From Swiss-Prot:
A purine D-ribonucleoside binds at H5, D180, M181, E182, S204, D205. Its EC number is 2.4.2.1. Keywords: Glycosyltransferase, Transferase. The active site is at D205 (proton donor). This is Purine nucleoside phosphorylase DeoD-type 2. It comes from the Bacteria. The record marks R218 as: Important for catalytic activity. The keyword Glycosyltransferase applies. It catalyses: a purine D-ribonucleoside + phosphate = a purine nucleobase + alpha-D-ribose 1-phosphate; a purine 2'-deoxy-D-ribonucleoside + phosphate = a purine nucleobase + 2-deoxy-alpha-D-ribose 1-phosphate. Gene3D superfamilies: Nucleoside phosphorylase domain (3.40.50.1580). Catalyzes the reversible phosphorolytic breakdown of the N-glycosidic bond in the beta-(deoxy)ribonucleoside molecules, with the formation of the corresponding free purine bases and pentose-1-phosphate. Belongs to the PNP/UDP phosphorylase family.
């Protein structure tokens, strides 16, 4: 049965869904990496696809930009379509000095300036964590493919253009690896609905050093990350 934001039918989604922010990136993943692909939803042009990877059923769907958008799609996938594993695949801006362009960052935990998880938890702090089984498998797959990987805390920002000029230095001091805009919200939804979630990010720029990937290196880095995510998805 369709939801307000997803017009797929029951059974259209695999138990594991890979979720980039950009719906066109979801289309790229489906067309590049999956076989026997079927488009299962297109409401608001937020495309979703299901196919197979090495013979195993996998789905991919965009979640939009920011915690509110991501939470809507993740909630509906889990609550209405029976999805059990959500793996966000995206990019981040690095802040810690030992994190480099093209590294893969896996968000073991996610800090945030959003109140979304405080709203869930009677205004208390909530430790937004990845599922350990997903995390362990992703690290294993990254190392098997010789992809440089860092595991630790990320920061999910509500504002892309932040007015807090000193926040990145404080993040670095606290050991935060990089900044995205969704992980903390996704982890909160998964915890609330008793599902599993993980965030895998490729480092597209270094905020403090002012470094950025070229378009060619950005694509290669994304493809490397996707192979890690897909191998994780089929080995759960």
């Amino acid at each position: 049965m369709a939801t307000p934001h997803i017009n797929a039918q029951p059974g259209d989604f695999a138990e594991t869904v890979l979720m980039p922010g950009d719906p066109l990136r979801a289309k790229y993943i489906a067309e590049t990496f999956l076989e026997d692909v079927k488009q299962v939803c297109d409401v608001r042009n937020m495309f979703g696809f299901t196919g197979t990877y090495k013979g195993k059923k996998v789905s991919v769907m965009g979640h939009g930009m920011g915690i509110p958008s991501a939470c809507i799609y993740v909630h509906e996938l889990i609550a209405e379509y029976g999805v059990k594993n959500v793996i966000r695949v995206g990019s981040c801006g690095a802040v810690r000095d030992d994190v480099n362009l093209m590294d893969v960052v896996i968000g073991m935990g996610a800090s945030t300036d959003s109140k979304v998880n405080r709203i869930r938890f009677n205004d208390h702090d909530f430790a937004a964590l990845a599922d350990y089984g997903l995390l362990e498998e992703a690290v294993k797959q990254a190392r098997a493919q010789n992809v440089p990987v860092k595991v630790g805390n990320v920061f999910s920002a509500d504002l892309f253009y932040t007015p807090e000029a000193d926040i990145f230095e404080k993040m670095e001091k606290l050991g935060i690896l990089g900044v995205d805009m969704e992980a903390a919200g996704i982890y909160g939804v998964a915890a609330d609905l008793k599902a599993k979630a993980l965030t895998i990010l490729t480092v597209s720029d270094h905020i403090i050093r002012g470094e950025k990937l070229s378009s060619e290196d950005r694509q290669k880095s994304f493809n490397d990350m996707m192979k890690v995510a897909l191998e994780t998805a089929i080995n759960l």
